[in-house]
């Protein structure tokens, strides 16, 4: 799945959100995916920021608009605007901090409260490079993903392990849902899901795609 550099030309624009506790590595996952950068001194995100990257999927240029916000409670006031229009999410926890995994259910509930319940969600166990410090096993991550019908990967933003794969898988699944619905409807779907367009892509009519647990950690 190749990257695509002409950022102003695309066939589809999908909004993704990064969620999870502060300090789990959301910002570094974003910078690794969009700019291939990692910052050891990365501080907690203040407010909201987003970045974009385009990929070529099945011959179509898919532009991802990925939003990142701090996980700290005092920023919860931005919740509604943050989630609005999102068709995919990466729910991130730190494999070395079990408390960040324990809050995953709360983050998932909040996500589903503000979006379609069948939004494409990838559960991410980040910082897999810190193998000697792991407190959340791969099996625990898989079990939670299976229970909640999520996709699952373990990543390392530091070592760039599975970062591209995780984002690409989410975008691919969204595109497949949109494409299938377009074929069934006999027309071409809207290319944009940006909130200002007043349009969202409703994925609940093809929930069977999401209700199959898929482990992507290999």
Curated annotation (Swiss-Prot):
Its main location: membrane. A motif (Effector region) lies at residues 42-50. It is found in: Cell membrane. GTP binds at residues 20-27, 68-72, 126-129. A lipid is attached at residues 215-216 (S-geranylgeranyl cysteine). Pfam families: Ras. Belongs to the small GTPase superfamily. Rab family. It comes from Lotus japonicus (Lotus corniculatus var. japonicus). The keyword Oxidoreductase does not apply. GO terms for cellular component: plasma membrane. The lineage of its organism: Eukaryota, Viridiplantae, Streptophyta, Embryophyta, Tracheophyta. Keywords: Cell membrane, GTP-binding, Lipoprotein, Membrane, Nucleotide-binding, Prenylation. It comes from the Eukaryota. The keyword Phosphoprotein does not apply. GO terms for molecular function: GTP binding; GTPase activity. Gene3D superfamilies: P-loop containing nucleotide triphosphate hydrolases (3.40.50.300). This is Ras-related protein Rab11E. InterPro entries: P-loop_NTPase, Rab_GTPases_membrane_traffic, Small_GTP-bd, Small_GTPase. It is a lipid-anchor.
């Amino acid at each position: 799945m190749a990257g695509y550099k002409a950022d102003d030309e695309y066939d589809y624009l999908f909004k993704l959100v990064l969620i999870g506790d502060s300090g789990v590595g959301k910002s570094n996952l974003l910078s690794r995916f969009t700019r291939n950068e990692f910052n050891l001194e990365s501080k907690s995100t203040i407010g909201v920021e987003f970045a974009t990257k385009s990929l070529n999927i099945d011959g179509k240029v898919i532009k991802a608009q990925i939003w990142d916000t701090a996980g700290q409670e005092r920023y919860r006031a931005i919740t509604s605007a943050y989630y609005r229009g999102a068709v995919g999410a990466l729910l991130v926890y730190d494999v070395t901090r079990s408390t960040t995994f324990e809050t995953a259910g709360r983050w998932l509930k909040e996500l589903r409260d503000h979006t379609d319940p069948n939004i494409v969600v990838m559960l991410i166990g980040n910082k897999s490079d810190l193998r000697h410090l792991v407190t959340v096993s791969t099996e625990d991550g898989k079990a939670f993903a299976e229970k909640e019908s999520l996709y699952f990967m373990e990543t390392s933003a530091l070592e760039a392990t599975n970062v591209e794969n995780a984002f690409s898988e989410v975008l691919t699944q969204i595109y497949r849902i949109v494409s299938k619905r377009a074929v069934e409807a006999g027309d071409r779907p809207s290319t944009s899901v940006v909130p200002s367009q007043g349009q969202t892509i409703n994925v609940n009519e093809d929930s069977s795609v999401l209700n199959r647990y898929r482990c992507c950690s290999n």
